[in-house]
Amino acid sequence: MQGYIQESDFNLVEEGFLARDLMEEIINEVSQTEDRDAFFVADLGDVVRKHLRFLKALPRVKPFYAVKCNSSKGVVKILAELGAGFDCASKTEIELVQDVGVAPERIIYANPCKQISQIKYAAKNGVQMMTFDNEVELSKVSRSHPNARMVLRIATDDSKSSARLSVKFGAPLKSCRRLLEMAKNLSVDVIGVSFHVGSGCTDSKAYTQAISDARLVFEMASEFGYKMWLLDIGGGFPGTEDSKIRFEEIAGVINPALDMYFPESSDVQIIAEPGRYYVASAFSLAVNVIAKKEVEHSVSDDEENESSKSIMYYVNDGVYGSFNCLVFDHAHPKPILHKKPSPDQPLYTSSLWGPTCDGLDQIAERVQLPELHVGDWLLFENMGAYTIAASSNFNGFQQSPVHYAMPRAAWKAVQLLQRGLQQTEEKENVCTPMSCGWEISDSLCFTRTFAATSII
């Protein structure tokens, strides 16, 4: 084992474990106290399962986890143990990853517009791979980080994505030749091309077009004497099963596009920047009802079967905390009752509100719930992406803590996977059986296509 994560970092649980089981234990424990604070349960086994699924679906692609999506220490540690790289966007994210013990060669500073002091920090700490999309960035890097290995980020069609990024980042194709020429004149090393089709992309064809465009930029670069060897296909992969498009569908489009434009014989190494893919479904959140208010309504004759009141519930996490995903990530979290109601309990039109003094701190509007009481719990699933990472301490409310769990079989799979990664350095093709009865495939093959140490 690499030693990035230890058994003391999580609760080791038996097979058949569900996040709900650990939540139940914690709820029972904290309900004996006055502090019934909101909390997360993170199933690291789900992260491991996603990693195996990624390697199977995109065998030529090395994942560089997008730290901005969820910077929880447990997530960073388990992905470091699994051999993933890391997509960092700031000095703070680089510090976080390197504090865990990750080598700088496994980090790409994937922010095309960086503060000069942070470029110098990357240089001082050995982080060489970084992205750019404009002339000013090239000038800054040439002065502040002469050993940088630059990756040209190109614009894409992200019109079918929930969070469009090309409005802010990415050079249009018509500008790429000029940027490459300038890089050559400044003696800046350009090693490859990157793109991002947007977060929450629902159009897999966007990847095909972007990969095709990247091939054109590779050809432009050769005109200036560059021999590019890296393609970064970004992220945007779905992280929950209820997404409009499945991850395997996207992979089914990416793989033939890579084979067409960047065949294995080209010796181009492929990386990606999955974020929500890894963590969205791994995190569940429990919140406690801290206050309630009934609102009476007049009822007409034709509405006599409807309730005459609605109820406002106030819970101890909100939009300024973990539910910032409503604002920044177009999320629509749905509450799950902790206590199963009786069939004859009436439902009331209800709204859920966070704990802060801001009237905008509303989690849900017009949801049908049985009557709840102060001290009751509500659960929310699929809360791992862009929740913790953007939460604040507004009004003095603290971020909800995370309790990590790892199924024993998943931990065994991590150990088997780690042995395979170590053997990769010694043999070109190794097939490590995954015989714990838990994994998604009968075997996991490791090839020299992208070993953990192959970016140097």
Swiss-Prot record:
Transmembrane segments: none annotated. GO terms for molecular function: ornithine decarboxylase activator activity; ornithine decarboxylase activity. One of its GO terms (cellular component) is transport vesicle. The active site is at 357 (proton donor). The keyword Nucleus applies. InterPro entries: Ala_racemase/Decarboxylase_C (IPR009006), De-COase2_C (IPR022643), De-COase2_CS (IPR022657), De-COase2_N (IPR022644), De-COase2_pyr-phos_BS (IPR022653), Orn/DAP/Arg_de-COase (IPR000183), Orn_de-COase (IPR002433), PLP-binding_barrel (IPR029066). It comes from the Eukaryota. It is found in: Nucleus; Cytoplasm; Cytoplasm, Perinuclear region; Membrane. One of its GO terms (biological process) is positive regulation of catalytic activity. Antizyme inhibitor (AZI) protein that positively regulates ornithine decarboxylase (ODC) activity and polyamine uptake. AZI is an enzymatically inactive ODC homolog that counteracts the negative effect of ODC antizyme (AZ) on ODC activity by competing with ODC for antizyme-binding. Inhibits antizyme-dependent ODC degradation and releases ODC monomers from their inactive complex with antizymes, leading to formation of the catalytically active ODC homodimer and restoring polyamine production. The N-terminus domain is necessary for its localization to the ER-Golgi intermediate compartment (ERGIC). Belongs to the Orn/Lys/Arg decarboxylase class-II family. ODC antizyme inhibitor subfamily. Monomer. Interacts with OAZ1; this interaction disrupts the interaction between the antizyme and ODC1. Does not form a heterodimer with ODC1. This is Antizyme inhibitor 2. The gene is azin2.
